[in-house]
């Protein structure tokens, strides 16, 4: 068990009652609206906040237990914490900031490890600079490096992207993906941005009004129609992990395989065999009850309906099982009635557009060639 | 350069500089501690501590000197005990002048340091804590460097104010040439002496030069430290 937490804490007018565990060593997102208790939760895990009651365990070792009075101080928990506002020490250079945690770690990183982390985050050219001269994205990367260099047992990221504009966010997201895939540190990411969570998380804990309301793998949670209003998803989407099969160099296309079938997308910069993560917006999925012919879309995936939920206005959301992968489609209620859709009904999903992110490194979102 | 000054006058100048230096150095550690306490902690009696710190600003210096005299005179219980136990004598000694200056200028130091400490983001200490730094470590390596502009500004202001202290010194340790006759006391003495107008003018000019120099130095130092600390 990477992390297990039961946290009960009262503020005036707010009560946090979280209980969740992280088994997966990858990236777990704590996802929920502002004010739902996300930051309080990670502050309690880090030791910066002492909960009224509860128990927190990291890799099987308790760090807090109100029953026995155990409360390991934050400085002894070895939990890396990257704050939303980076919190670099303004009086130290980037190098001084990076060394701050490394020098105090009971297990200081070797110079080879230091070099690898600096290289991974692309901050080698910033070492002599002062934090005040860095951009927002650079600051977050240095803060990530500072936390990693203490060789933490767990890494907490509290909305590290929230204060950044789109360009800065695009600059740091690939680093977070690499971190997730290469650093071998379990990561807990706090976020209220669905896009980031869908792109980065392996597992999601959904939190609302101080309670964890759902937890599980990202594809399962994001496609659960009953959670749509809670996750604040105005536009439902499916998340699918696929393998790169081969490239059609002349056509500029790449064929991907997942357990529901195959998809052609605009060329992905990854070798065959590499894993990619697909995000497919429900509104980009059309449904047909028989195999359509003479249409421009090339990606047709068979499946059957498992659930229909009322969507906003004239729309409804349809959940499909495509060979074990979950696909969501948003169509009008009139179309659903016309096609006679209901649970169990076999359909063909026509996918108009896919966003692709490599699992292991940077890649901009790509769109399907033909719509 | 010293041709215009008599031996007694240069003696007063050096004594002034020494008294002020010792006063500032002695008051600095408690000033840093007090400023930190007032900047970051809430405790019962905080308002009282705050008022006590500021008392020397509003109390007439003569009263302060009088209070010191009745507390630390060699015949007073505390002063007698210090003298007999440690051989420490404040009354009628330059160390007494330094003590009086230290107390009078204490609020200047506390105010400047407290302001710069209050401006430090408490989140930085939290970040240091998650990186493995204990309380003293955080204070020395995060709080103190970031408060340095305030510490320097406070020290220089207090130093300049010490150079001008008159009432508390003359009341507590009297006006002894070579021992407690600092610049202001020397000016006062020159004015009281027939034919001493020229000496008074020279010493006054010296005082003005010292004060202006101190202020300029304070601004330069604060600006440099701000630049170095990246703020």
Enumerate the predicted regions with their spans:
Chain B
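Interhelical loop and adjacent transmembrane-helix boundary motif
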Residues: 1-8, 172-212
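Transmembrane alpha-helix signature in integral membrane proteins
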Residues: 9-38, 57, 102, 155
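Transmembrane-helix boundary motif in ABC transporter permease subunits
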Residues: 22-53, 66-68, 116-118, 123, ...
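Transmembrane alpha-helices
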Residues: 25, 110-113, 117, 121, ...
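C-terminal transmembrane helix and the adjacent membrane-cytosol boundary/short C-terminal tail
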Residues: 45, 107, 111-125, 129-133, ...
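Transmembrane alpha-helices and adjacent helix-loop boundaries
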Residues: 59-65
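Membrane-interfacial helix termini and adjacent extracytoplasmic/periplasmic loops
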Residues: 65-102, 172-177
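Non-cytoplasmic
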Residues: 73-74, 151-189
């Amino acid at each position: 068990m990477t992390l297990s937490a039961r946290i009960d804490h009262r503020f005036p007018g707010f009560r946090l009652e979280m209980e969740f565990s992280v088994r997966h060593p990858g990236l777990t997102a704590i996802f929920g609206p502002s004010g739902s208790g996300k930051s309080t939760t990670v502050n309690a895990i880090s030791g910066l906040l002492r909960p009224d009651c509860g128990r927190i365990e990291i890799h099987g070792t308790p760090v807090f237990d109100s029953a026995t009075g155990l409360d390991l101080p934050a400085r002894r928990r070895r939990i890396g914490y990257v704050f939303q506002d980076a919190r670099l020490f303004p009086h130290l250079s980037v190098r001084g900031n990076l060394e701050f945690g490394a020098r105090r770690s009971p297990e200081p990183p070797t110079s080879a490890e230091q070099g690898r982390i600096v290289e991974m985050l692309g901050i080698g050219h910033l070492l002599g600079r002062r934090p005040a001269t860095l951009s927002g994205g650079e600051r977050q990367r240095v803060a990530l490096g500072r936390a990693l260099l203490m060789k933490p047992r767990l890494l907490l990221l509290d909305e590290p992207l929230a204060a950044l504009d789109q360009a800065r966010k695009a600059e740091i997201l690939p680093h977070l993906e690499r971190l997730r895939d290469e650093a071998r540190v379990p990561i807990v990411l706090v976020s209220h941005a669905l896009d980031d969570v869908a792109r980065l998380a392996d597992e999601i804990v959904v939190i609302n009004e101080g309670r964890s309301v759902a937890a599980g793998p990202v594809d399962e949670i994001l496609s659960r129609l009953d959670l749509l209003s809670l996750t604040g998803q105005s536009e439902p989407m499916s998340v699918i992990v696929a393998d790169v099969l081969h490239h059609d160099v002349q056509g500029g296309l790449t064929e991907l395989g997942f357990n529901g079938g195959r998809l052609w997308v605009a060329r992905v910069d990854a070798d065959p065999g590499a894993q990619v993560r697909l995000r497919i917006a429900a509104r980009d999925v059309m449904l047909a009850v028989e195999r359509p012919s003479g249409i421009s879309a090339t990606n047709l995936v068979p499946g059957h309906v498992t659930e229909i939920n009322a969507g906003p206005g004239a729309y409804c959301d349809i959940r499909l099982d495509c060979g074990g992968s979950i696909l969501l489609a948003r169509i009008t209620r009139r179309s659903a009635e016309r096609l006679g859709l209901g649970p169990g009904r076999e359909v063909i999903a026509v996918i108009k557009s896919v966003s692709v992110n490599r699992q292991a490194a940077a890649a901009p979102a790509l769109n399907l060639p033909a719509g | 350069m010293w041709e215009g000054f008599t031996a007694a006058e240069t003696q007063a100048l050096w004594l002034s500089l020494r008294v002020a230096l010792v006063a500032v150095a002695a008051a600095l550690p408690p000033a840093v501690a007090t400023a930190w306490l007032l900047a970051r902690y809430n405790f019962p009696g905080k308002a009282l501590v705050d008022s006590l710190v500021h008392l020397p600003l509003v109390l007439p210096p003569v009263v302060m000197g009088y209070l010191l005299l009745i507390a630390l005179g060699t015949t007073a219980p505390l002063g007698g005990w210090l003298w007999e136990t440690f051989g420490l004598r404040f009354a009628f000694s330059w160390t007494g002048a330094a003590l009086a200056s230290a107390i009078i200028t204490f609020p200047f130091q506390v105010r400047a340091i407290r302001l710069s400490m209050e401006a430090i983001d408490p989140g930085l200490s939290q970040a240091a804590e998650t990186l493995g730094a204990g309380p003293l470590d955080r204070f020395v390596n995060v709080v103190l460097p970031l408060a340095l502009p305030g510490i320097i500004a406070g020290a220089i202001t207090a130093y300049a104010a010490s150079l001008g202290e008159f009432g508390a010194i003359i009341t507590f340790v009297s006006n002894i040439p070579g021992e407690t006759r600092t610049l202001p006391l020397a000016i006062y003495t020159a004015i009281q002496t027939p034919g001493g107008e020229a000496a008074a003018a020279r010493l006054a000019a010296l005082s003005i030069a010292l004060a202006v120099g101190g202020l300029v130095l304070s601004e330069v130092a604060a600006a440099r430290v701000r630049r170095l600390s990246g703020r």
